[in-house]
């Protein structure tokens, strides 16, 4: 009986672990679908992109720049023409911001 209980607990733990991994992985895929990839154009800066997307709220712009730098593994806030960045703009709304979207 003790051996059967141990097997049951082990299998139950394995199934729960697999479910948790699946849900967390699926969430990351869905998260990526909520953003757009853009190609940086001549004259673009993170601050200018933040201004186009976030408007007048300075605090939101700082959060935007931090998010973009973190998610795109940018060592500095300097971006160059040709860089491809992921931005936190839902794809269905990206046309509002007149961004050069890379599909």
UniProtKB/Swiss-Prot annotation:
Residues 36-87 form the LysM domain. The keyword DNA damage applies. The keyword DNA repair applies. It holds the Pfam family LysM. It comes from the Bacteria. Gene3D superfamilies: LysM domain. GO terms for biological process: division septum assembly; DNA repair; negative regulation of cell division; SOS response. Keywords: Cell cycle, Cell division, Cytoplasm, DNA damage, DNA repair, Septation, SOS response. GO terms for cellular component: cytoplasm. Inhibits cell division during the SOS response. Affects a later stage of the cell division protein assembly, after the assembly of the Z ring, by probably suppressing recruitment of FtsL and/or DivIC to the division machinery. It is found in: Cytoplasm. This is Cell division suppressor protein YneA. The lineage of its organism: Bacteria, Bacillati, Bacillota, Bacilli, Bacillales. HAMAP family: YneA. It comes from Bacillus licheniformis (strain ATCC 14580 / DSM 13 / JCM 2505 / CCUG 7422 / NBRC 12200 / NCIMB 9375 / NCTC 10341 / NRRL NRS-1264 / Gibson 46). Belongs to the YneA family.
